A protein has these predicted regions:
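Bacterial Sec-dependent N-terminal signal peptides
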Residues: 1-22
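Short, compositionally biased P/S/T/A/G/V-rich stretches that sit at domain boundaries
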Residues: 19-34, 136-155, 239
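Aromatic-rich carbohydrate-binding modules that target alpha-glucans
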Residues: 55-108, 179-195, 200, 255, ...
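Exposed beta-strand face motif in extracellular beta-rich ectodomains
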Residues: 111-117, 208-214, 310-314
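Conserved structural position at the C-terminal beta-strand
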Residues: 119-121, 216-218, 318
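Basic K/R-rich, polyanion-interacting modules in nucleoproteins and related proteins
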Residues: 231-273, 330-392
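Substrate-binding/active-site clefts of carbohydrate-active enzymes
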Residues: 376-550, 558-577, 587-594
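Active-site-proximal helices and loops of the catalytic beta/alpha 8
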Residues: 433-434, 441-444, 558-667
């Protein structure tokens, strides 16, 4: 695999194709303004013809009064490649473009402290945009001295100081709902201590978590005001109790009660967790607080009274009282062991015919939720498939996105006769687990147990696999488990996020990932496979696809990335024999064979014979042996173009590599290589 070359090309391409228009000027009327006032934003210096269009669209987001970005950028903007028509700016007679709106109405939020804007083409792909610009909200300046983070955890016996400074004389009113808890009049400074429920001091106590709002009203003009919001989470008391039966991480179904499920989350170094979903109206209270299992310190939760024919979803809100520097106090994530998710980022671009009746992402929520679809069952026609022998495999590799115009599993089902006429006996699917965005090769995975909905439903993939098995065709799945991308809950629960924008790489306390990659071919965030939690996660991924989807084999992508012995700049180390990854990957093969004795285990290693022999000859006397990806592109292509130089194909024979049996997957083409026929037509030896 040559993804480092591809990445270089992409970076190079972006620098050439970028169409950012830098020399623009922004203005707003009135100025200054409050968030509840109608405003008119104008930009000058934009030439949409440079983007091959006549129209300009506003893309906007906002920050709360504590300068924390709170927008999902979904509800009003549309998609980056398809802005909503409602965001089109008006072209003025002087060549400027304007847009009028009331911030509180557009964003459906009170207490806006800053608004970010840029102008763009309807399809902003290729950086058809202007740089970011920001407008401060409010007719006077407020400085929040404390708390510096929002939300903030209030210790039960402790206190939090709310301290604010204004440039004007202000009347301050501290609200809980509609109730004024405290007021301070004709002051520039505001200060009030909020006490925990078990505090021994007298004063303003909070018994439960709540949002306090501070109304800051100009003494000379009551129409000139600003709101500050403080989300105060009173430290709850988690109940320590054993679950009714042994749970695995993720969703657990109660075999004796179909209306009940149990959740388990392993979150080391986290203090308490809430489960929020459509079954409890996303309410954070003691009823949504997860229990703690005293025997393993894992969080668990019971959800009951579920209707078999209704869809449900949930999200974890994970809290840390003392996070490492740069890490958030709270983060909202879906379950890392999700089998399906709903996403605020991608779902509105998924075609209805690919995934019918996909639930609409819940309003006023952000991020991703685990989707519980209890009615999604499949009755297999072939329950025990007699796989082709390893040495007889003829594999056809497919990127579902590009196979047919609709980019769906249904396309594959409709072409079964085409596959049969090719006389292949195996199909290898490039990654179909949940990846970031909808247009991808799939190697930017974020949820390895979750199916990406862009290609179709869970049952459609199962139908395709079942149909292949009925026609003697095995199905192999490409698996990228050396890394993950930033939406993964395994990253986000322990991430480095100093700018508090809810995105970042692994922090130094993340139990799953290296902060710096331990090999030279890394993309995304590098798994530490010597950690037991990572090994558990990997085995759960293997188990899921074998047991639930009857996948016949895995092509393990970039197995050079499964070492802890090197660093991201040492090519010699990465490409040399590493005992830790030899042993580790053997253990993963053993686990696969424990679930399916005839499972195909294929490594894309492209390394030295000494290392590949360890795997190819492993348990070969039992009929096992790991199959090695064997690139022969240049040699085969030299022959197909009619050249003698560099046309020796002897290494296509397993014996040339020291393998005791036929465990070499020789190929002339793959997704990483140029098409042979293209070179045949353009560079053939035709004197």
């Amino acid at each position: 695999m040559k993804r480092f070359f591809v990445l270089f090309f992409l970076l190079f391409s972006v620098s050439i194709l970028s169409q950012i228009q830098d020399n623009v000027t922004w203005s707003v009327e009135p100025n200054p303004f409050n968030d509840s006032e109608k405003i008119k934003i104008t930009v000058s210096g934009v030439d949409p013809s440079k983007w091959s269009t006549q129209d300009v669209y506003l893309w906007t987001w906002f920050f709360d009064s504590n300068d924390v970005e709170v927008s999902s950028q979904i509800n009003w903007n549309g998609e980056w490649n398809n802005s909503k028509e409602s965001m089109k700016m008006t072209k003025n007679s002087d060549g400027t473009f304007s847009f009028e709106f009331t911030p509180t109405e557009l964003f459906q939020y009170n207490g806006i402290g800053k608004i970010g804007v840029l102008a763009k083409a309807k399809n902003g792909t290729g950086d058809k945009k202007t740089p970011d610009y920001f407008f401060e909200v409010g007719k006077f300046d407020l400085t929040v001295n404390s708390p510096k983070i929002n939300p903030v955890i209030l210790d039960r016996e402790g206190s939090i100081s709310i301290s604010v400074t204004s440039t004007n004389e202000v009347n301050y009113y501290l609200y809980k709902g509609d109730e004024v808890l405290f007021e301070s009049l004709n002051n520039k400074n505001f200060s009030k201590d909020v006490l925990g429920p078990d505090s021994g001091s007298d004063g303003l106590k909070l018994i439960e978590s709540t949002t306090l709002k501070l109304l800051c009203e100009d003494t000379s003009d009551s129409n000139n005001f600003m709101y500050l919001s403080f989300d105060i989470v009173v430290e709850p008391i988690s109940i320590e109790t054993e679950p009714p039966f042994e749970l695995k991480d993720g969703i657990n179904y109660d075999n004796n009660n179909s209306s009940k499920i149990y959740l388990q989350l392993n979150a080391p170094k986290k203090d308490f967790v809430y489960v929020l979903g459509n079954f409890n109206d996303y309410v954070k209270d003691k009823k949504s607080l997860m229990n703690i299992n005293p025997s393993n310190n894992k969080f668990w939760f019971e959800i009951s009274d579920l209707n078999e024919n209704e869809n449900y979803w949930y999200q974890y809100q994970v809290f840390s009282k003392s996070p490492v520097s740069g890490s958030p106090t709270v983060i909202k994530v879906a379950d890392p062991f999700s089998n399906l998710i709903i996403s605020s980022y991608d779902d509105n671009q998924i075609p209805e015919n690919s995934f019918p009746n996909l639930p609409k992402f819940p309003e006023n929520q952000i991020g991703e939720f685990t989707f519980i679809n209890k009615s999604e069952k499949y009755d297999w026609n072939i329950t025990e498939f007699d796989k082709p022998k390893k040495e007889d495999l003829i594999i056809y590799e497919i990127l579902v996105r590009d196979f047919d115009k609709e980019s769906s599993f249904q396309n594959l089902i409709d072409r079964i006769e085409y596959f049969k006429n090719l006389n292949i006996n195996a199909i290898e699917l490039m990654p179909v687990m949940e990846f970031e965005g909808n247009e991808s090769w799939g190697y930017n995975s974020s949820y390895h147990l979750s199916l990406d909905k862009f290609y179709g439903t869970q049952n459609k993939l199962k139908e395709f696999i079942d149909l292949c098995h009925q026609n003697g065709i095995a199905v192999i799945l490409d698996l990228a488990l050396n890394h993950v991308f930033g939406r993964s809950p395994l990253v986000k629960m322990w991430m480095d996020d100093p700018d508090n924008d809810s995105w970042g790489g692994p922090s130094n306390e993340n139990p799953y990932f290296n902060q710096s990659a331990k090999h030279t071919y890394s993309v995304g965030y590098d798994f530490n496979h010597q950690n037991e939690l990572t090994q558990y996660y990997t085995k759960r991924v293997v188990e899921h696809w074998i047991n639930d989807y009857k996948i016949d084999g895995f092509r393990w992508d970039l197995t050079k990335g499964f070492t802890q012995n090197c660093d991201e700049n040492n090519y010699d180390c990465t490409n040399s024999f590493q005992q830790d990854r030899v042993d580790l990957l053997k253990s993963y093969a053993d686990y696969s064979w424990s679930l399916d004795p005839d499972h195909y285990v294929i490594f894309e290693h492209l390394g030295s014979n000494s290392e590949e022999m360890e795997w190819a000859n492993y348990r070969i006397n039992e009929g096992k042996g790991i199959m090695m990806w064997g690139k022969m592109t240049s040699m085969f292509n030299q022959l197909s173009m009619g050249y003698n130089d560099n046309s020796d194909i002897s290494r296509a024979d397993h014996k040339s590599r020291g393998f005791n049996d036929k465990r070499l997957v020789t190929y002339a083409e793959s997704h990483d290589e140029e098409r042979i026929m293209y070179k045949n037509l353009n560079f053939q030896n035709n004197p």
